[in-house]
């Protein structure tokens, strides 16, 4: 099923009704229903002998930031980024918020971006769209369809995403994940996201097993 997470509703001429423009990974989007309805859906599916596979995104959030050219050290004056409509800026038509609601991404605001934050403490790749699909670094660190690309090589991001997606297993009893845009995330991310056995921060497959789902399913989209 499509991602049920709370999303950016719209930006400019496009809309996030489909569930792939996350704003908060642990809330149900109002137009999808409620958590209780989702729980009932999974329960009824199981009673009919069906598995429920939830679609998820670990590559990007919504389109809150417009980045037309990769941000570089030259874009900072006295330690602060020079916001420019020709290069990078916060999307003014984002609805209902101008930035994600969830940490850590809510901490980064391109309008207040400092050099130190960009260089050492950013949870976004402040780069333009993918330009070379034969270059893995370009694919992993640039945006797909202009959607804000997460720094999935960050341990902070990796640890939080594991927890955010254990949440749905715990709350609803789903049977697996179909991982959207998996081709644009470095393979090392998935080793921990899926298989980590640390009891304090399990990967999603291991967590599924701990909940009695020996066959918890994970597979990715690649195109």
Give the residues covered by each predicted segment.
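Substrate-binding/active-site clefts of carbohydrate-active enzymes
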Residues: 3-167, 171-172, 192-197, 222
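Short, surface-exposed helix-loop/turn micro-motifs enriched in polar/charged residues
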Residues: 17, 48-49, 178, 207-210
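Acidic-and-aromatic substrate-binding clefts and catalytic sites of carbohydrate-active enzymes
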Residues: 31-34, 182-188
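Short catalytic-loop micro-motif centered on adjacent basic/acidic residues
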Residues: 53, 176-180
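Aromatic-lined carbohydrate-recognition surfaces of secreted/lumenal glycan-active proteins
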Residues: 53, 61, 185, 200-223
């Amino acid at each position: 099923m499509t991602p049920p997470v709370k999303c950016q509703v719209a930006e400019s001429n496009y809309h996030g009704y489909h569930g792939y423009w996350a704003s908060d990974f642990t809330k149900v989007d109002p137009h999808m229903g409620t958590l209780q309805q989702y729980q009932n859906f999974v329960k009824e599916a199981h009673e009919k002998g069906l598995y429920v596979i939830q679609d998820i995104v670990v590559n990007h959030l919504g389109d809150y930031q417009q980045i037309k050219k990769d941000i570089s050290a030259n874009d900072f004056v006295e330690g602060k980024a020079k916001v420019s409509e020709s290069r990078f800026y916060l999307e003014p038509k984002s609805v209902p918020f101008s930035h994600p609601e969830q940490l850590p991404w809510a901490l980064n605001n391109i309008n207040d971006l400092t050099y130190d934050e960009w260089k050492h403490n950013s949870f976004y790749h402040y780069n333009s769209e993918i330009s070379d699909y034969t270059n893995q670094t370009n694919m992993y660190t640039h945006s797909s369809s202009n959607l804000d690309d997460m720094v999935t090589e960050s341990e902070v991001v990796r640890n939080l995403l594991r927890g955010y997606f254990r949440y749905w297993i715990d709350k609803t009893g789903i049977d697996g994940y179909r991982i959207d845009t998996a081709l644009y995330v470095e393979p090392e991310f998935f080793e921990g996201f899926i298989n980590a056995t640390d009891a304090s921060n399990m990967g999603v497959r291991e967590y599924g097993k701990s909940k009695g789902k020996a066959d918890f399913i994970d597979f990715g989209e690649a195109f």
